[in-house]
């Protein structure tokens, strides 16, 4: 609900920082993710559409914010100064030329990579047709475009997630759990004071979901093996449901 968030921020003079880390090329209501807020954050982690191996980028249209960010990433040194002037405390978060060159090549290949991954996700989704009673799958609403970061599956029955994980392991298909609810399922944020159960829907996704890769270098054989494994694991869930 970005319109509502931006409206509240404007009313109370707040800054909107968009977490666009895994949303390269994604759209919300026809508008690219990253265009809504005052600042947008992108990650160049190795699994993302554009990768530098590590690192990331912050984008903004505000020149003052850009100067502060550029200063902060370089030990707090005054941006564009030839002297060692430090008006603020900063960190060392500068990307080296080697990493940047890898990222620039990724930018030049962006849409080829994006479209190839979208194609693979579509194949995975087609393999899951008929199993909508078992799980929720990666979907797109009208006017929205998902970033093809991975193919997500969230089980509707808590007992099914282990079946899918075990079947994936059997055929050596790598999977990762869905991201847990930050305030209640990550120990690092326990000081926020929330107890398990405060965010039941988010916690369900964290406990009962997983995602698998859709890397653009997957071969036809790789994709076929994943589809076969998806069908087998979801079929086992359906059979258990009927017992």
Task: Identify the function of each model-found stretch.
Residues 16-18, 42, 60, 177:
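Hydrophobic residues in well-ordered beta-strands that form the structural core
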Residues 18-52, 81-85:
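Conserved active-site segment immediately N-terminal to the catalytic lysine
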Residues 35-74, 97:
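Active-site PLP attachment segment
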Residues 1-4, 11, 27, 63-243:
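PLP-dependent aminotransferase class I/II
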Residues 8-12, 16-18:
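C-terminal EAL-domain catalytic cores of bacterial cyclic di-GMP phosphodiesterases
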Residues 15, 21, 217:
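A short, conserved beta-strand element in the Rossmann-like catalytic core
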